[in-house]
Regions:
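ABC ATPase NBD Q-loop/coupling interface
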Residues: 68-83, 359-375, 379
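Conserved ABC ATPase "signature" region
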Residues: 120-138, 397-409, 431-432
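Conserved ABC ATPase signature
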Residues: 142-146, 150, 413-417, 421
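ABC ATPase C-loop
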Residues: 159-160, 431, 436-437
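Catalytic Walker B motif of ABC-type/P-loop ATPase nucleotide-binding domains
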Residues: 167-170, 443-446
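H-loop/switch region of ABC-family ATPase nucleotide-binding domains
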Residues: 203-204, 478-479
Length: 553
């Protein structure tokens, strides 16, 4: 019998000075050629498990480990990351902290050089991995000119260039647009199916990858809560933790339909078998309570929080200066909640940085009369202390920490928090105005849902709605269409530096091929959230009457 790629026996781990273990008596086997999806709430231990599988736990982080952990036949307690590096590749939540070379080519060549590969072997490996990840055009770019999504693909390429037996990915689609995210999952599936590479990825956006997985392991408080097939996971999540359910499965559950689907294709097939025809392009009557603007005073309606007029921004990308933003005309008023969307490199982050006066336009103007606070893609950029409580001191700071669920973390180092926890701390800092010297008229956030589970996203949406209700405009650059559908009162879509769509979420997120929610893709329009989709399906079920054997509950 072949030895598993990874074998954990009663494996536990506690970080230095932590009161509770991060991993508790894990009993797991990861087989050769499996594609495993790690699910679970933020801070549940998913990232720690990945770090253990590549040897960073305990060799880099320290702390106490017990039990047995073997990866590719090596005892991880005796063999660290250097010895596992050629066998196990790792892509972290924040790729900007993983990329160390000044150019993309140098980043990909570095692991090959360290292994002593010849120039010919390096050239071939670079050609293959850059083609696979569609980054050939980036090879000679300085890494500090890349967008977050481009950095994500470069970090993955560097992890794959040695062709490891096992690849570990922590939130790999978190900074990728829907197109690039689908391409990445397709690539991982191809590597898994055609080359037998083991894949373990931790994700919160399960709708992107559940259909590609062979197996789902859900982790909660450092222990395995579920281990089984994607189909069984959907049924388990619906009963045990609906926050983990992907949107399509959640819609089916709310409508009383079974079985719960693991993909858009499976959902459409089930609806056809049940004889439920949903008319594509039906007007979307839903507008979630959270998405309704409440701050509507006459004077405030006429005022402006953020305004761009014929905005042009240039950037040196390493291959010459190019226009990153062109002819942008945009007015955002107090109380609006705007989702700024578009492909990687479309100009979303540049627009937010221009609003915060971090870069200057070459033509036109962008104004924020009452100032603009910015949460950057890397939340760690805002941390200046070694203690969470010192980032937001005093009673007001403690209230801000409590609002993001971090009141118990006041004594921890911000850099030791999980990715989702760091994001929440940064949001508290920005919303409190600490990053801009006071309360601003516009609060801008760049990919704030990275590392967050469904429950935390809903909490974030509620907090941002409260900020907007108090009179500040909230602008969120995001690839998370599901979050945008429930949070935003308006969606602005950028394409290659230009504004190409601007309207209600129901208009923008239902009609497109890629910037559409899972519910919209299943139904062909008519609804964009699980709640709205379930209402539409229940209406169709009632129209069909007693001839349809569906239990409405």
């Amino acid at each position: 019998m072949a030895e598993p790629l990874a074998n954990l026996r009663a494996f536990s781990y506690r970080y230095p000075d932590a009161a509770e273990p991060a991993l508790r008596s894990l009993e797991l086997e990861l087989g050769e050629g499996e594609l495993v999806l790690l699910a679970g709430p933020s801070g549940s231990g998913k990232s720690t498990l990945l770090r253990a599988l590549c040897g960073l736990v305990p060799h880099y982080h320290g702390g106490e480990a017990s039990g047995e952990l073997r990866v590719c036949g090596l005892d991880v307690r005796e063999h660290g990351p250097a010895e596992l590096g050629g066998l196990v590749g790792m892509v972290f939540q924040e790729p900007e902290t993983q990329v160390v070379s000044t150019t993309v080519r140098g980043e990909l060549e570095l692991p090959l050089e360290l292994r002593g590969e010849s120039a010919a072997a390096r050239a071939r490996a670079l050609e293959e991995v850059s083609l696979a990840l569609a980054i050939s055009h980036l090879l000679d770019r300085p890494t500090d000119t890349l967008s977050g999504g481009e950095l994500q693909r470069v970090a993955l390429a560097a992890a794959l260039v040695l062709r490891p037996r096992l690849i570990l990915l922590d939130e790999p689609t978190s900074q990728l647009d829907p197109v690039a995210g689908d391409e990445l999952i397709g690539l991982l599936r191809r590597l898994n199916e055609e080359w037998g590479m083991g894949v373990v990825l931790a994700e919160h956006r399960l709708e992107r990858c559940l259909g590609a997985a062979d197996r789902v392991i859900s982790v909660d408080e450092g222990a395995v809560a579920f281990d089984g097939s994607p189909q069984d996971f959907c049924a388990w999540a619906d009963e045990s933790d609906p926050q983990l359910s992907p949107p399509g499965a959640r819609m089916f559950a709310l409508a009383g339909l079974r079985p719960l689907p693991v993909s858009v294709k499976a959902a459409r097939s089930s609806l056809r078998e049940l004889g439920i025809a949903v008319r594509a392009g039906e007007p979307d009557s839903e507008e979630p309570e959270q998405a309704r603007p409440r701050w509507r005073g006459r004077r405030e309606r006429q005022s402006i929080a953020l305004s761009a007029r014929d905005l042009w921004v240039e950037r040196d990308t390493g291959g010459g200066v190019r226009d990153v933003l062109r002819r942008v005309e945009l007015t955002i008023r107090p109380g609006e909640r705007v989702a700024l969307m578009g492909r990687n490199g479309a100009g979303k982050s540049t627009l937010l940085r221009a609003a915060a006066r971090l870069i200057e336009p070459v033509r036109g103007s962008i104004e924020a009369p009452d100032g603009c606070s910015l949460l950057p893609q890397s939340p760690s950029d805002l941390f200046v202390h070694e203690r969470v409580g010192d980032e937001l001191p005093g009673d007001e700071g403690l209230r801000a920490l409590a609002s993001v669920g971090l009141e118990q973390a006041v004594e921890r180092d911000p850099r030791d928090l999980s990715g989702g926890e760091r994001e929440r701390l940064a949001i508290a800092i920005v919303s409190a105005g600490r990053s801009s010297g006071g309360r601003s008229g516009a609060v801008c956030l760049d990919e704030p849902t990275r590392g967050m589970d469904g429950a935390r996203k809903r909490e974030l949406g509620g907090r941002l709605a409260a900020i907007a209700a108090a009179g500040q405009a909230v602008v969120v650059a995001t690839h998370d269409v599901e979050f945008a559908a429930g949070f935003a009162t308006r969606v602005v879509l950028l394409g290659d530096g230009e504004l190409i769509a601007d309207g209600r979420p129901a208009e923008i997120l239902a009609g497109g091929w890629y910037f559409a929610t899972e519910v919209a893709r299943i139904l062909g329009g008519g609804a964009i959230t699980p709640e709205g989709g379930a209402e539409l399906l229940r209406s169709r079920i009632r129209e069909l009457g007693a001839g349809l054997e569906v239990e409405l509950r």
